[in-house]
């Protein structure tokens, strides 16, 4: 039974997250229906990251096991054809080696968050950025973000509904930079807690507008208390950008 590794991108706006849910539109559900239409097999899609409602992906990694062996290009093209007009695209397909697993073999996941920082609202990127009117100090945000790098208890930045066994995570990267009218945040870790990136982003935005200081972010992290978190950023600007193995 061949295992196919796929890299996909999607616009998360129409979906109630990646993970399949009965009677609700999800990315996983759309892909599984496309596969069934292609080859008649009922399969389960496994993903590197189970993104939330409205979250996008530029390079989500998934795998499926099929009874029949197909050329990788055929799998890609057929699934894409049956996905239309869903805003999901299979970019790459290859046959996985050994016991490789999209979720459990991953060693790093990267997320990017886009904040549109200007007075005027977005027209073309509505639903793809978080619009913040007040001027943000990206350098101050970046400096504050460095308190998040390393191995920490991230209870403060963990959603109360998070089902992870432990709040301990190692943040390998936390950067903030300005690109014209946008402030872009990037985070890298082996894995993340539920709504961790959005919680950190919303908190760092408080630094950007001058309500919080870098010391406040450090104190919030050390509090290990969800009530110490700043506002949670909306899903609109969040993208899964890379998975490493």
Predicted regions and their residues:
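Structured-RNA-binding interfaces characteristic of tRNA pseudouridine synthases
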Residues: 1-245
């Amino acid at each position: 039974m061949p295992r196919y590794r796929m890299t996909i991108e999607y616009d998360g706006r129409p979906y109630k997250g990646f993970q399949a849910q009965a009677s609700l539109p999800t990315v996983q559900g759309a892909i599984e229906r496309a596969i069934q239409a292609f080859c008649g097999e009922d399969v389960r899609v496994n993903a590197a990251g189970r993104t939330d409602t409205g979250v996008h992906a530029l390079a989500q990694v998934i795998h499926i096991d099929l009874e029949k062996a197909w050329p990788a290009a055929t799998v890609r093209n057929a699934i894409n054809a049956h996905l239309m007009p869903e805003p999901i695209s299979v970019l790459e397909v290859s046959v996985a080696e050994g016991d490789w697993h999209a979720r459990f073999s991953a060693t790093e996941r990267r997320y990017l968050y886009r904040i549109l920082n200007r007075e005027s609202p977005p027209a073309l990127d509505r639903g793809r950025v978080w619009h913040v009117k007040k001027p943000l100090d990206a350098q101050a945000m970046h400096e504050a973000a460095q308190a998040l790098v390393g191995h920490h208890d991230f209870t403060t930045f963990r959603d109360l509904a998070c089902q992870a066994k432990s709040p301990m995570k190692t943040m390998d990267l936390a950067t903030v930079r300005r690109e014209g009218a946008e402030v872009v945040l990037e985070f890298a870790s082996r894995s993340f807690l539920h709504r961790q990136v959005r919680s950190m982003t919303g908190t760092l935005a408080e630094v950007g507008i001058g309500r919080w200081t870098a010391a406040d972010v450090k104190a919030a992290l050390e509090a290990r208390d969800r009530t110490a978190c700043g506002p949670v950023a909306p899903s609109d600007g969040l993208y899964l950008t890379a998975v490493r193995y």
